[in-house]
Amino acid sequence: MLSQASSISLGEDNSTDALNAPFETLLDANPISNQFEIAAMNIEYDFNLPAEDVVSYKGVKSNDNGDAGMVLVVEAADGKAEEVANQLTAYQQDQVAFYGNYAEFAQAQENVENAVIAFKDNTVVMVIASNECTADLDSAVDSALGE
């Protein structure tokens, strides 16, 4: 488990039991094809989340070309949930711009535009529908956050 570390340790399972239930709820609603696990390096460099803001996380993305599907659950440090959510929104905007460069990725771009980012207490979630997803992700997020 991470705690105010200067850098997230690579190669560790950075999830905690508290993240498993919301993660599984979201993954059930939004099955991700050809999954790859989001690594500590991605948390810091792709999402630009400072290590001191992240206690733990669990996430997967689709490794399929043109499928932006993703489920990410972050346990933010005390008082950092809103900052983490804001940084995930910045990531979302970057991804919208990226997919906008490719006409063949119109579905992925739309899915990123409609991503759901929410937080409750120190738990922050970001869900991008996979191309195959038909579930209502808003209600899945509410359920995952115990709303």
Q: Which residues fall in each region the model found?
A:
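N-terminal "mature-domain start" segment
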Residues: 1-55, 145
